[in-house]
Amino acid sequence: ADAASYISRQPERNIRILEKYRNDKRYLSKRNFLKERSIFGLDFVFREIPNKLDVFDMKTFKEYDGRFVIVTTDAKTGKVHYFDQKDVDETFEVFCATCALPGACPPAKINGRKYYDGGLSNPIPIDKCLEDGCDKMLIVLTQPEGFIKTPRKSEKNMAKIMKLKYPAIAEELLKRCDKYNESVRLCEKLEKTGKAVILRPKYKLNSLESDTGKLR
């Protein structure tokens, strides 16, 4: 979803929002989880900010003449599902799906179905780029060179919980690390052959990094 601000020609918008609101309890906090079952304040992040506080240029976004793909995971099947800019409206529900992580945020409801973050089924959708005919790719990774994702006990425990209601998501949780590492290897292979350029930090970042200085 962060890339949307580049499509709307507002490249400074993401860091501006993070610097101003990342440590605001309305943005992300345990209090939100108690109130909404989500660590993110979904209404604040996806309704109040883009529609009032730091307005997202929906008109420019919609007029983009390329295709902007949003990657999600179908909660029932565990399969990857792709949306594009025509599916985005002022509710930003499609973007809500991109932060819907099991245990941290409920799935987003879109057209009668529920969706989780695409990172579960397709962590780095480089295969989608290749299928769509892209011959030169700019790949932005969130971890430094040499990083290998390893299973965490918390993920295994969450998979057990998710298995009761969303068994397919539970399976994807357990396969997530292998899929991520495999995707990184493919990215590096493409970089060596000149088909991709990889941008990544020199230091490790937490998934919910609160140090906005590191993010800049």
Residues covered by each model-derived region:
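Patatin-like phospholipase
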Residues: 1-52, 84, 89-97, 138-141, ...
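Short, hinge-like loop/turn segments at secondary-structure boundaries
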Residues: 9, 155-158, 215-216
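Flexible, glycine/proline-enriched loop segments at strand-loop-helix junctions
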Residues: 32-40, 79-83, 113-116, 171-173
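Structural motif corresponding to alpha-helix initiation and N-cap regions
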Residues: 55, 122-123, 184
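Active-site gating loop/helix substructures
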Residues: 61-159
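C-terminal helical/tail subdomains of lipid-metabolizing enzymes
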Residues: 91, 183-216
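Helix-centered, glycine/charged polyanion-binding patches within enzymatic domains
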Residues: 136-189
